[in-house]
Amino acid sequence: MHPIIWELSHMVDLQAAAQKLKRCYQRRVAITAGGLKHRLMSSLIIIIIIRINYLRDNSVIILESSY
């Protein structure tokens, strides 16, 4: 499992997890500007985290629409 996914899936505060995920995502896209493969990987990480947290709190689904 990706270290970011593991860390976020063990966070109790979902708002903090959402903020951390947003920062990670923005950094990845910034590092490889226009890198399609990297963007797809970032999206995959977001989808996986949504699935991990879905049963705990449906508000995490907001992340999906913000990208």
Curated annotation (Swiss-Prot):
Cellular component per GO, a single term: extracellular region
**Range of residues in the leader sequence:** 1-21
What is this protein's record name? Vespin
Taxonomically, what lineage is the organism?
Eukaryota, Metazoa, Ecdysozoa, Arthropoda, Hexapoda
Compartments, record wording: Secreted
Q: What's its job?
A: Shows contractile activity on isolated ileum smooth muscle.
Coiled-coil stretches noted in the UniProt entry, renumbered to this chain: none
Top-level division of the source organism's lineage: Eukaryota
> What keywords are annotated for this sequence in UniProt?
Cleavage on pair of basic residues, Secreted, Signal
Q: In which tissues is it expressed?
A: Expressed by the venom gland.
